[in-house]
């Protein structure tokens, strides 16, 4: 995080989202950068080096993968949805409480994926690869860029109560509808 003392601007950077994947040679990690001005994300980029895909957005200008416009999926029925999530590691806060909710949702959707890089999960929602994504205990650097990209692709990003406090409380739900 880099702040300029003259104006309310900060860069939010995650140089390696999906660190555990990288350590274990799992090819699912990214570099994530967002620009925040006056407490609002206004520009964002997520780069997946192994696929050479660059997802980006500027507030009010749409979302893109490289130079192609991306949009969230149009899946309407929850039972047809492919949902991404993150599961707290065994022994971490919230792990035991998370499992019953995960089981419930698993029985209601087409499929669940746990990929291990929140920024990529979010841009997958933006690109229509996932229909939704939820996770808790996230850091701002994990979700700042991806959240703008989802919104600019026509999706919605909130916390678990439907509010826009996800950057502060680390609880995020991204969906393919507004």
Which residues make up each language-model segment?
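Flexible, acidic active-site loops/lids enriched in D/E/S/T/G that coordinate Mg2+ and/or position polar
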Residues: 1-38, 45
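Conserved catalytic motifs of the protein kinase core domain
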Residues: 8, 28, 40-42, 52, ...
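An extended, acidic
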Residues: 71-178
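Conserved G/P- and acidic residue-centered "switch" motifs that form tight phosphate/ATP-binding loops
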Residues: 19, 48, 150
């Amino acid at each position: 995080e880099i702040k300029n003392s003259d104006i309310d601007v900060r860069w939010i950077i995650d140089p390696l989202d999906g660190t555990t994947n990288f350590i274990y040679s799992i090819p699912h990690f990214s570099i994530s950068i967002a620009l925040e001005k006056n407490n609002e994300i206004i520009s964002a980029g997520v780069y997946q080096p192994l696929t050479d895909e660059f997802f980006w957005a500027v507030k009010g200008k749409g979302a893109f993968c490289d130079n192609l416009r991306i949009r969230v999926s149009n899946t309407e029925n929850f039972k047809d949805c492919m949902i991404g999530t993150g599961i707290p590691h065994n022994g971490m806060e919230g792990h035991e409480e998370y499992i019953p909710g995960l089981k419930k949702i698993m029985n209601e959707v087409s499929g669940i994926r746990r990929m291990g890089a929140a920024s990529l999960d979010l841009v997958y929602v933006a690109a229509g690869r996932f229909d939704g994504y939820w996770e808790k205990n996230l850091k701002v650097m994990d979700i700042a860029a991806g959240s703008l990209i989802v919104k600019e692709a026509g999706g919605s990003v909130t916390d678990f109560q439907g509010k826009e406090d996800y950057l502060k409380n680390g609880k995020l739900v991204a969906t393919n509808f507004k």
